[in-house]
Curated annotation (Swiss-Prot):
Identification of the protein by name: Glucose-6-phosphate isomerase
Alphabetical UniProt keywords: Cytoplasm, Gluconeogenesis, Glycolysis, Isomerase
Pfam families in alphabetical order: PGI
GO cellular component, one term: cytosol
Location(s), subcellular: Cytoplasm
Secretion signal span: none
PANTHER family: GLUCOSE-6-PHOSPHATE ISOMERASE
Isomerase found in the keyword field: yes
Amino acid sequence: MELSRSAAWSALVFHKHEVDKKTMRDMFAGDSDRFVKFSLSWKEMLLDYSKNRITSRTMELLLELAHSAGVDEKRQQMFQGAPINFTENRSVLHTALRRPPGYVLEVDGLNIGDEIAGVLFQMKNFCEKVISGKWKGYTGKSITDVVNIGIGGSDLGPYMVTEALKPFAHGGLDVHFVSNIDGTHIRETLKRLDPETTLFIIASKTFTTQETLTNAMSAREWFLARAVEEEYIKKHFAAVSTNQEKVVEFGIDDANMFRFWDWVGGRYSLWSSIGLSIALYLGFNRFEELLAGAHAMDEHFLNEPFNRNIPVILALLGIWYRNFFDAASHAVIPYDQYLHRFPAYLQQLDMESNGKRVDENGHTVTHATGPVIWGEPGTNAQHAFFQLLHQGPDLIPADFIVPLKSQNPSGEHHDMLLANCFAQTEALMKGKTEQEVRAELSDAGYDEADIQKLFQHKVFSGNRPTNTILVHELNPFMLGSLIAMYEHKVFVQGVIWRINSFDQWGVELGKQLARTILPEIQSAEAVTAHDASTNALINMARTFREENIRKESAQLSFF
C-alpha cells in the first residue's frame, strides 16, 4: 500500500483541517502548560517544540505513524548491523564508531569492535607524536600546520567540527581544509604555509576521487618544489583510505594510512579515521569526548520511548510540515558563530540522505521526501532572510540552536544574542495582528489615511513554526550529541518515507559526464556530441582556453 493511503497518513490529513482552525497564539493562551507538554530535557539539552502547529492529538497521530512505519524495527536492524543500505547491500554502522571499546559486533565475519579499536589506537599514537613535536619534518622541524584534502563527507564534517570547537583546540597546530577542485582553493591555502612544517592528510576512501587526487597532486608538487626528494613525502603526507596500493604509489608510508570501512557512509564518516584532522587539532582526548557525546545520543535514541525521544520528535515534526503543509524547505539557525558551518554540514546529511524519489520497492514515491536545508548564524540571518520567514508566502519551519554559555563572554553580547533568539521565535509564533498594527501606528501619530495605506505591510501573520534547542555549552560532548541527534532524525524520516537514506546515486551522473567533457574542453576540435546548450558552453570554454594559451605563448616569445 502507498504511504499516502495508509490509515495513519489519512488520519493526519483529516486532522490537519482541525489544526488549521487554530493559531499557536490561541493555543498558548488556552493552555498554560503547553511548554511543559511539548518540551523535552536530556542531559544539558532542552528541546522546546511548543511553538509548533500541533496539539496533543497531532503528536498521538504522528507517533502512530512512526510505529506503523516500523521505525523501531528498522532502528534495531541498523544498530545490529543488518544491511539496511539495500541498494548497496551494506550495513550502516557509524554508530559503532562511537561505542566504548570492548564490544563484539560481527560484520562479514569480522568483529568490527576490534577493527575500530585498532584504528583509534593508531590515530591516538599518531596524534601524540605530531602534537608533542616528536614527529619531525624533513628538515627536523616540528609540524605547525595540518591540511586536510578531501571533499563531501571527508571535508564538511571535520571542517564543521574544527570550526565549532575552536575554543577547545590545544593551540599547537593550525588546521586547514581544501576541497574544491577550483585551483584557487589549494593555492590560497598553500601560499601562507611552509613545506618544512606542513602535514597533509589525503582523505579519500578509494584514493581515486578526482577532486581530492587533483588537489593532492598539486600539494605534492608544491611540497617537492622545496623538498625535492620524494622520500620526504613520508614525513609530510598521511592518508585516510582503503586503497593501500594507491596510497603507497603516491609515496605515503602505509604505516600512516588510516583505514575505514564500506559500512561508513561519507556523510557519517567524521567519527572514523576521517576525523583525524579533528583529533590533531583538538587533541585525541577531545575527539573521544566528541564520540562520547554522539554515543550518549545513540543510547537515548535507541532506548527512549518515541514520545520522549528527541530525534523521533524532530523527525515527526519535519514530516508534519513537509507532507501535510507542503513546506519545501527547513531553516537551521545556530545562534553561535562557532556553528557557522553547521547548516552546510546538515545540508549534506539531510539532502544527500533523503533527497530521493524512489522507494524501497523501486516505485516512484507519491509523497514529498527530503526538504531543502539552509541557514546562517543568528543574528546575521535576521538581517538577511528573516523577512521571508516572517512575511513570505511560504511556510518555512526553523530550528534555533543556542548555547546558554558563551565561550567569549564580553559585556552584554551574549545576553543580547539570547534576547534576539528568543524574540525571533516568539515573533514567528505570535505575529502582529491588524488591530495591533493600527494601534501602534496611531500611537506613532499617523492619521487614518496613512494607516490605511500602510497597515497591511506591517501585519505579521505569525503561526510560523520553530523548534528551539538550548544547550548549556557548546563543547565536544554536546556537539557530538547534536550531530547524532540530526543523524537519527534523518534516519527516522527515511524509514517513514520508505526510502534508502544511505546511498547517494544522485552524485554519480554529473561526475560521469564530467569525465567525458574534460578531454573535450582540452581538444582542438569543435564539440558536437551533446545537446546544443552543452556543446556551445564547451566550445566557448575551448575557444577561450586556446586563445589564452596563444596569448601566453606570445608573451613568453616576446621576452
